[in-house]
């Protein structure tokens, strides 16, 4: 199985990135390739600097659209469905590839959300991108342990 996390953010080497690497390593024990990809280009930088919500959302869509492959695509958004960990683990059943998308500061353009199979919310709280990435990676690992009856989730 291949799981990818695409995030509108600048790549950084910090404690959050180390935690992401930790969960990537743990996922491999279940024969799952977890990839974390930070996406940030000139168009996104210019739109965000101008604080233009519509332009920023469009820039996110254009940057991420090409990653909407044959995988099961899930957008993280505050309006998305809330899951408990057991329900979240069901997302991975009978799937070979799952893509998660974490938008930028201005969220996703409606057309991009319609291109995804579902929308997911990690919490009613607003989370910073780095925190959201780590929480998502931990929940992915937790979901894998639930699927494989591993004691981590208990």
From Swiss-Prot:
GO annotations of cellular component type: cytoplasm
UniProt-listed CDD domains: RlmH-like
Catalytic activity from the UniProt record: pseudouridine(1915) in 23S rRNA + S-adenosyl-L-methionine = N(3)-methylpseudouridine(1915) in 23S rRNA + S-adenosyl-L-homocysteine + H(+)
Main location: cytoplasm
Keyword S-adenosyl-L-methionine: yes
One Pfam family, short name: SPOUT_MTase
Regions crossing the membrane: none
Its EC number(s): 2.1.1.177
Binding residues annotated for S-adenosyl-L-methionine, in chain numbering: 76, 103, 122-127
Matches recorded under InterPro entries: Alpha/beta_knot_MTases, RlmH-like, tRNA_m1G_MTases_N
Alphabetical keyword list: Cytoplasm, Methyltransferase, rRNA processing, S-adenosyl-L-methionine, Transferase
Signal peptide location: none
Enzyme class per UniProt: transferase
Intracellular or extracellular location(s): Cytoplasm
GO MF entry, a single one: rRNA (pseudouridine-N3-)-methyltransferase activity
Quaternary structure, from the entry: Homodimer.
Similarity field: Belongs to the RNA methyltransferase RlmH family.
PANTHER family referenced in this protein's UniProt entry, alphabetically: METHYLTRANSFERASE (PTHR33603), RIBOSOMAL RNA LARGE SUBUNIT METHYLTRANSFERASE H (PTHR33603:SF1)
Record function comment: Specifically methylates the pseudouridine at position 1915 (m3Psi1915) in 23S rRNA.
Name used for this protein in its record: Ribosomal RNA large subunit methyltransferase H
Lineage: Bacteria, Pseudomonadati, Campylobacterota, Epsilonproteobacteria, Campylobacterales
